[in-house]
């Protein structure tokens, strides 16, 4: 089990990052809520990971805190929720917002997330309610740790903020037309990719 990775952030293209650890590059998929908190390319980062082995692939999912990883692990135990949908849920809302949805029985907000239908939302509310109590108790005094040390500068591939934002939304399961419309609606000159993604996601929830 690979539970934690610390190394140089070499590539950063939502929702995936590449972290170099002693010459070995680890591709890690992250929810956008964690992705936003990463340092700039060329700096050192620490992420907590969940390792998945499938017949056709070995995948790493990364999180900025142990508590976010714990919530991800609870989500994928819910009937009908796999790692991809769990990432989509945690990309569309913070852990705190998800907990609030469960506490309020807020199906209307959950079904706005791509891939979450009414039945899945109902299962999430029922199955997660008791599980979240223990998680939130463990979250008291939680730490967010990532380190920013290095003079290394990695090459950056040029992409416009709009292209980055649309690509990120598509990776979460939104349709091309939905992604383009949402990004165009909130785009302003000079906005960076991460702010544009946040605004576009917020406009769809």
From Swiss-Prot:
Gene3D superfamilies: 5' to 3' exonuclease, C-terminal subdomain, DNA helicase RuvA subunit, C-terminal domain, Nucleic acid-binding proteins. Keywords: Cytoplasm, DNA damage, DNA recombination, DNA repair, DNA-binding. GO terms for molecular function: ATP binding; four-way junction DNA binding; four-way junction helicase activity. Transmembrane segments: none annotated. Belongs to the RuvA family. Has three domains with a flexible linker between the domains II and III and assumes an 'L' shape. Domain III is highly mobile and contacts RuvB. This is Holliday junction branch migration complex subunit RuvA. The gene is ruvA.
């Amino acid at each position: 089990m690979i539970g934690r990775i610390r190394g140089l952030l070499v590539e950063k293209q939502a929702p995936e990052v590449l972290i170099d650890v002693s010459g070995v590059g680890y591709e890690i998929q992250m929810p956008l809520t964690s992705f936003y908190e990463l340092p700039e390319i060329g700096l050192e980062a620490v992420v907590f990971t969940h390792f998945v082995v499938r017949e056709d692939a070995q995948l790493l999912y990364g999180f900025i805190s142990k508590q976010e990883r714990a919530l991800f692990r609870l989500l994928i135990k819910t009937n009908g929720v796999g790692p991809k949908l769990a990432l989509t849920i945690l990309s569309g809302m913070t852990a705190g917002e998800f907990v609030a949805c469960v506490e309020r029985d807020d199906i209307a907000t959950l079904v706005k997330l791509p891939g979450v239908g009414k039945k899945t939302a109902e299962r999430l509310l029922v199955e997660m309610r008791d599980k979240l109590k223990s998680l939130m108790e463990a979250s008291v005094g939680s730490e967010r740790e990532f380190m920013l040390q290095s003079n290394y500068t990695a090459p950056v591939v040029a992409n416009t903020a709009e292209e980055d934002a649309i690509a990120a939304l598509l990776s979460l399961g939104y349709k091309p037309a939905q992604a383009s419309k949402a990004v165009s609606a909130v785009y302003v000159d000079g906005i960076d990719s991460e702010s544009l993604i946040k605004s576009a996601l917020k406009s769809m929830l």
